[in-house]
Amino acid sequence: MKNRMKKLLVLATAATMMTAAFTGCGSSSDGADNNADTSADKSADEGTSNENLSGSLSLAGSTSMEKLCEALKESFMEKNPGVTVTVEYTGSGSGIESVTAGSVDIGDSSRALTDDEKANGVEENIVAIDGIAVITDKDNSVTELTSDDLKKIYTGEISNWKDLGGKDEAIVAIGREAASGTRGAFEELLDVKDQCKYAQELDSTGAVLAKVGSTPGAIGYVSLDVLDDTVTAMIIDGVEATEENIVAGKYLLSRPFVMATKGKIDEQNDIVKAWFDYVNSDEGQAVIKKVGLILPQ
């Protein structure tokens, strides 16, 4: 009898220990799952950080996208110290040619891709929306134009500010070089492609801003996010160039910022995928908004 009682006691003790062990394992598993979920959510919010990721990423193209690219480059490299990102600002057309040829990973374009470019296997990845501001020197008394006035200025039909209610002063029409995405978008939106008569064609957004700001009678166009107090942004068709008006579809001159790839993003190498993961993360989206651009809808 005593032996039987001892056996029962041993079995009961073993059962209790096994139950406790299984309970402990269950608690540990739940905690691990919760931690994993929290970690995944945090990673999605902040963008993927991978200290083991190493190599290089190359971008080339639009000068209008310099402010955006530099901000993304800096924050991405902080999160991925093993990756070196290089960006060359060669113009949208050149950037698309480079990514098509495979000489860079990403081609930056401040205009939509053409059907021919897409036919070559280039994927249009829109990362932001930008407005094109029409600018004049600070001393110009004309602050509003219709889109028709703007067309006539750039096609040479109107050549003096007095014809628009301003002082007797020649209009100096400043534009970008032929390969510029800003120029391509501006001329396409105004329906004046290959019709413009420029006094000067400059090779960067900054050069246009500086030239217009220092030249009496000058008019030009630049990316909305680079506007400063050295120039006046004109009202077009009664609408100011603001983020709110662009989102509402009221402002005529807006265009996409594209980071083009040869093929779809999921076909790219791990570093390119990580770049787009970051751009599309909450942290990356905050960078886009911080530099004055609009998130694509």
What are these regions (language model features)?
Residues 1-10:
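Bacterial Sec-dependent N-terminal signal peptides
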Residues 6, 15, 266:
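Short, glycine-/Ser/Thr-/acidic-enriched flexible segments
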Residues 10-18:
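Hydrophobic helical h-region of N-terminal Sec-dependent signal peptides
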Residues 19-24:
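C-terminal motif of bacterial Sec signal peptides marking the signal peptidase cleavage site
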Residues 26-93, 97-101, 105-297:
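Exported/periplasmic ABC-transporter solute-binding proteins
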